[in-house]
Design a protein with these regions (language model features):
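Two-metal-ion RNase H-like nuclease active-site motif
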Residues: 26-36
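C-terminal binding/interaction regions
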Residues: 1-19, 57, 78, 83, ...
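Flexible, glycine/proline-enriched loop segments at strand-loop-helix junctions
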Residues: 68-71, 98-105, 157-163
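Catalytic-site beta-strand/loop segments enriched in glycine and acidic/polar residues
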Residues: 82-114, 118-120
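Acidic, glycine-rich active-site loops and adjacent beta-strand->loop/helix elements
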Residues: 99-102, 126-131
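A glycine-rich, hydrophobic loop/mini-helix early in the fold
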Residues: 36-91
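Signal-transducing coiled-coil linker helices
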Residues: 21-25
Length: 226
């Protein structure tokens, strides 16, 4: 399974576009996941880019058909994200994804995978470095800049921002900066998606008390091992 995924990722990575392919941004989306039992809850929020007012929200619950495998998170979470985004009536001009973009060993983290699958501009935002090293504020992998660190709050650890698909390096950083609303550390669309996914998770648990949160989930990856 891993060998197959690796070969597919290497092929897909060649299709990733790291340049701006979008017009003026009016709507920005954020997506985050929660887990209950063996199901993935994917929540997507669409906000007005200037005001961060919520325009639309959707969610989906999909069975996780692939186990958690470090650096292959896309095969576990992307199907739920794609289904949730496809339910939207108002499509975002750019989608912010809780995970890595090209700052990934094979240049195709969750944000890149989702961007390719949906053919939309995406940006990855993670809370820990997956691979490479930091030089000043740049994420450098194999002597190539793959993204940037971003400190959004005083005394807070940085976020790791990288293009997913159809967004350039500098634009990725600027878009994420524009989506920060203190006191929240992470971009507002992802913050809201996180809250929404958690709300759905609790509702599902209340309907079926035997369901339990899956503690070995993507938050480990979001921490460092996508």
């Amino acid at each position: 399974m891993v060998k197959k995924f690796r070969e597919e990722q290497l092929k897909l990575a060649k299709k990733v576009v790291v340049k701006d392919e979008f017009d003026k941004i009016k709507l920005v989306g954020g997506v985050d996941q929660a887990f209950v039992g063996n199901e993935v809850i994917s929540a997507v929020i669409v906000c007005d880019y200037k005001t961060m007012k919520v325009i639309e929200k959707q969610y989906t619950v999909v069975k996780a058909n692939v186990p958690y495998i470090p650096s292959y998170l896309s095969y576990r979470e992307a199907p739920a994200i794609i289904e949730a985004v496809n339910k939207l009536e108002k499509k975002p001009d750019v989608l912010l994804v809780d995970g890595h973009g090209i700052a990934h060993p094979r240049k195709i983290g969750l944000a890149s995978h989702v961007g390719l699958s949906l053919d939309i501009p995406t940006i990855g935002i993670a809370k820990a470095l997956l691979c490479g090293e930091i030089k000043e504020d740049r994420i450098v992998i194999e002597e190539s800049t793959r993204g940037y660190t971003l400190v959004t709050k005083e005394h807070a650890n940085p976020l790791f921002v990288s293009p997913g698909h159809r967004v350039g390096l500098k634009s990725s950083l600027e878009i994420v900066k524009n989506c920060i609303r203190l006191p929240h550390k992470i971009p507002e669309p992802i913050h809201l998606a996180h809250k929404y996914a958690d709300k759905i998770r609790k509702e599902l648990e209340n309907k079926n008390p035997r369901l339990k949160p899956n503690i070995f989930n993507h938050k480990k990856e979001f921490g460092c091992i996508e």
